[in-house]
């Protein structure tokens, strides 16, 4: 992605590379950057965002960055790589920041500036690894050799464990105090007004740096294991009860039979 380097205008001394690129900075040591924007922005561009390359324009419009100060000659005092940096490097300042930032990008980052495929690929890899681990745990839990765990069954189990439904979210929040203003994410403790917002946060929170989807999947896998354990206990105790009912019937008839000792 983009490489950001901070250019300080007030405070610590400015590096020699920045001074060689912007010689007017020494004469305008101000706390804000409007003066630098006047000297750096070319007069041909009607707005700062128009001077950016197309990939940076989409990033600025998407992130809401305004009052952008640019410099077409971002050579940074390097004669060997000056042409490369002049093509791939720009400078801008967000409206909420007292600093200006160098943005240097290569061809790979230009291709990734629109859809962020790395994040989607990492998310897909993480999801696939997690579902495969769950499927392996399910297959290893069956001890009988006749249970071969076919692929269709594992695909169904993966789909059931991967999908987080509204019932799963409400079940996870059952042990927490009831919220009156909305729905609370059990993983990150953030509040959302509706259940749909919470579901979209769990589904797409990986792009924002949250791992709530992984937490809910682990929780759902634990629930499935507990449910299987309880079902096994009921079957083991139900074998005795199944034999008790005909024994009681025989006792009523007059015979004595103890089928479950």
UniProtKB/Swiss-Prot annotation:
Plays a role in spermiogenesis and fertilization. The keyword Zinc does not apply. The gene is SPATA46. Testis-specific. This is Spermatogenesis-associated protein 46. GO terms for cellular component: nuclear membrane. Residues 140-159 are annotated as: Disordered. It is found in: Nucleus membrane. One of its GO terms (biological process) is spermatogenesis. InterPro entries: Spt46-like. Keywords: Differentiation, Membrane, Nucleus, Spermatogenesis. It comes from Homo sapiens (Human).
């Amino acid at each position: 992605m983009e490489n950001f380097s901070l250019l300080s205008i007030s405070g610590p001394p400015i590096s020699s590379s920045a001074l060689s690129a912007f010689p007017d900075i020494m004469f305008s040591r101000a706390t804000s950057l409007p003066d630098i924007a006047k000297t750096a922005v070319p007069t041909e561009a009607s707005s700062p965002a128009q001077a950016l390359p197309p990939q940076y324009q989409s990033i600025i419009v998407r992130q809401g960055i305004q009052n952008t100060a640019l410099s077409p000659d971002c050579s940074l005092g390097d004669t060997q790589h000056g042409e490369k940096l002049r093509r791939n490097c720009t400078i801008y300042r967000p409206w909420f920041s007292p600093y200006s930032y160098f943005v240097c990008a290569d061809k790979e980052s230009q291709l990734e500036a629109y859809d962020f495929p790395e994040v989607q690929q990492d998310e897909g890899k993480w999801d696939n690894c997690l579902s495969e681990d769950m499927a392996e745990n399910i297959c290893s839990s069956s001890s009988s050799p006749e249970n071969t765990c076919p692929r269709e069954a594992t695909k169904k189990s993966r789909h059931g464990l991967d999908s987080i439904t509204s019932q799963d979210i409400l079940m996870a929040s059952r042990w927490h105090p009831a919220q009156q203003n909305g729905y609370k994410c059990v993983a990150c403790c953030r509040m959302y007004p509706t259940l749909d917002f919470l579901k979209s946060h769990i589904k797409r929170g990986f792009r924002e740096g949250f791992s709530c989807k992984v937490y809910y999947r682990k929780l759902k896998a634990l629930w499935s294991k507990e449910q299987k354990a309880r079902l096994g206990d009921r079957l083991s105790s139900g074998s005795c009860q199944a034999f008790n009912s005909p024994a009681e019937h025989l006792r009523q008839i007059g015979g004595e039979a103890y089928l479950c000792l």
